[in-house]
Amino acid sequence: MCDIEEATNQLLDVNLHENQKSVQVTESDLGSESELLVTIGATVPTGFEQTAADEVREKLGSSCKISRDRGKIYFVISVESLAQVHCLRSVDNLFVVVQEFQDYQFKQTKEEVLKDFEDLAGKLPWSNPLKVWKINASFKKKKAKRKKINQNSSKEKINNGQEVKIDQRNVKKEFTSHALDSHILDYYENPAIKEDVSTLIGDDLASCKDETDESSKEETEPQVLKFRVTCNRAGEKHCFTSNEAARDFGGAVQDYFKWKADMTNFDVEVLLNIHDNEVIVGIALTEESLHRRNITHFGPTTLRSTLAYGMLRLCDPLPYDIIVDPMCGTGAIPIEGATEWSDCFHIAGDNNPLAVNRAANNIASLLTKSQIKEGKPSWGLPIDAVQWDICNLPLRTGSVDIIVTDLPFGKRMGSKKRNWNLYPACLREMSRVCTPTTGRAVLLTQDTKCFTKALSGMRHVWRKVDTVWVNVGGLRAAVYVLIRTPQAFVHPSEQDGERGTLWQCKE
């Protein structure tokens, strides 16, 4: 994010045709704009609003308002803090608020309501939000230019050939000398990984070329901005549809600014968020969700990075904690943890070799990106991937501080019938490896009936302290926060005289 921080000190001129007049930001306006206070809205995973608010308070020092419309938070910042907003890990999309109406009075008929939307466009305070949008746009342009320079340097090394081999030998030497795990080293030497790396570099170079070509054209030939209006509506007492509101409000915005409407290749996205009687007009600051990070090899049930971050925050990791995801899938949770909590060690495990392979590929890809960005060999990441059986983990008793995992829902993976055998066995094995008294577990599942039943039989080793209800791919799921009790683990064979009868994960 250093590119973004540097961009705040030097803005690019962008023509905004407001009432057929050009509004530009110059160096003389920079001081006043850096002190400008604006309201930023952010969409977050439904159910993790409070977690996102805590992150904003911790990293930006700003208090948050959680919207009545679930999945949104609002906070006030100065424009100079815009770079840090893009570094938030718990938010999906960002937008700057133009104006908020807490109790908007809708008329009785559709025609009257739509006419009010048309009149609203010319009454809104667009000036400051558009300045924020221009600063945000300058971030992307400067980032693309710097990215092209870095990638060209990487391309020269690749074409040279010898330097790449030297770099790889140096990386391998650094890895070996510091005793990093053998799994990452093996995958780094894997021909498939090398092919993925070269493909990644080629794609980035091509995209950078397109972006810089477009930016050079804009600098030489300023054009009228293209825009679209997106209406997000929730509530049953509205006499209009989302498309009707977007159409009429968008038409008024077009008449006011003389912009060109374009539903796909737009420069500005105007948001019209309606929830019951609450109406908020904003301008989008992100083109795609910020949860699209870290993962390059996807599986059938890849967890969103923002959800993974929210789950990790619930367990409050401390320095030097051992954090394990025993059913990691593509490794979204451990990878998110390794990037944000680098002073902990993260273990990603799964019984499926394909899942372990995806997780290892994602780890190697993230490491390679870090090396390309820094231009030198990396010390590695505090993470490892391993294949194991969740019901018989190759870990010492009481050796794990935190367990965070996404349990099989029984929908796309596994089955609800198998969960009745799997969940009790998982909780029992987790209680064995987790440290008594201080150990924590954060578990996500949609099969709440099965989990509640399994947990009721484990009350002597697990104590539930919180339940967070979230939306995962349209499914209502629960995140259970558990604390390991001081009760020492007792093997079932010592209780029943029968070894392993309750420890088998039945298929």
From Swiss-Prot:
One of its GO terms (molecular function) is tRNA (guanine(7)-N2)-methyltransferase activity. Gene3D superfamilies: 3.30.2130.30, Vaccinia Virus protein VP39 (3.40.50.150). The keyword tRNA-binding applies. GO terms for biological process: tRNA methylation. GO terms for cellular component: cytoplasm; cytosol; nucleolus; tRNA methyltransferase complex. CDD domains: THUMP_AdoMetMT. Catalytic subunit of the THUMPD3-TRM112 methyltransferase complex, that specifically mediates the S-adenosyl-L-methionine-dependent N(2)-methylation of guanosine nucleotide at position 6 (m2G6) in tRNAs. This is one of the major tRNA (guanine-N(2))-methyltransferases. Also catalyzes the S-adenosyl-L-methionine-dependent N(2)-methylation of guanosine nucleotide at position 7 of tRNA(Trp). PANTHER family: THUMP DOMAIN-CONTAINING, TRNA (GUANINE(6)-N2)-METHYLTRANSFERASE THUMP3. This is tRNA (guanine(6)-N(2))-methyltransferase THUMP3.
